[in-house]
């Protein structure tokens, strides 16, 4: 009989229990920081109607979503799909429940999303996202753009990274205004895509892509100069103004970006730069956009990203629900932490105690001991069976912080000792 291949599908991650424990610990610490900053936990379904997911996404998203077809229908007829992020489902959630919600709503979500991207090192097709979003009704102060970034920065500080994280921040209105001022609105979609991919390809390919869409030498020079602008507020604002493009949208974007930078400084955040390469690939962003990187490991790409979206719910309601949010890509983050050895992965054990009966005679009392430990909020297992004690203890040391050996003496005295593993 031919055996079935048991390897996981390419782009999907699975972990051994002790590694999963570290993954879960990081997820827990992120959730704790989100709560500390006033975000309330919610959950939305992993399966949504395709028309919901594609209402505003645009770009490459339609090519990347996983449609779900029932047994009796073709993929062309499928009307449901797996979510590709938490933000679009959140907008539907807001519209569905707006009469029962208080605004601004600070929402935290942690769960799996799916994208049909090409599987590669550090990138996954099934991945955990840890999101924070602030949603307003009719308006939302720029304060919350900084609030989201500060919350995410604090989350990264919670699990002992051995390298600093850096936020790269921009504002979509700046590029939109720049293109309007240069009368390049009709080529905006192409230019956004070229800029978004500019760090993933050699510089000459970026230049060639701009040539292919018919930019003049002067237009190309301005766009290339624009995307190379990064640094502090004063440097970037001056550089953009020196391009000589006048446009109200451009001015508004610069004003907003300056205000967000000032709020970040007021919140004692110094690990950020303004960077005009940051545009974000999803079309629903309208203002502030940001990505977090590990500067010493740029090859892994961003480990967090987000931005402001004014009109995400416009396809679902006439009411305005502006929002700003960000997401930590937990699988990508976990991959780089383990691959680059940027965190201590040996310290976390899945369980608190392993109860080890020497023989079957001690099984009953071992269960009593386990229940007693669980009543103290400990995670406990009993390692039963006829293996040698030494083998059982090796197993216990792998999965638990400590062990309790149960033999005849312990059963008779109803007393036991906890052996802690170093």
Residue ranges of each PLM-predicted region?
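Beta-rich nucleic-acid/ligand-interaction surfaces
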Residues: 44-63, 166-181, 279-286, 388-399
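Acidic, His- and aromatic-enriched active-site or binding-groove loops in soluble protein domains
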Residues: 63-74, 183-210, 294
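Short, structured secondary-structure boundary patches
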Residues: 54-68, 186-188, 294-296, 399-407
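TRNA-binding/sensing appendages of the translation machinery
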Residues: 1-84, 88, 146, 150, ...
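Positively charged, Gly/Ser-enriched RNA/tRNA-binding surfaces
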Residues: 19-37, 48-49, 76-77, 85-101, ...
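A general alpha-helix detector
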Residues: 11, 89, 151, 174-178, ...
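Short alpha-helix boundary/capping motifs
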Residues: 5, 58-63, 180, 184, ...
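Phosphate-rich ligand and nucleic-acid binding surfaces
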Residues: 178-185, 217, 244
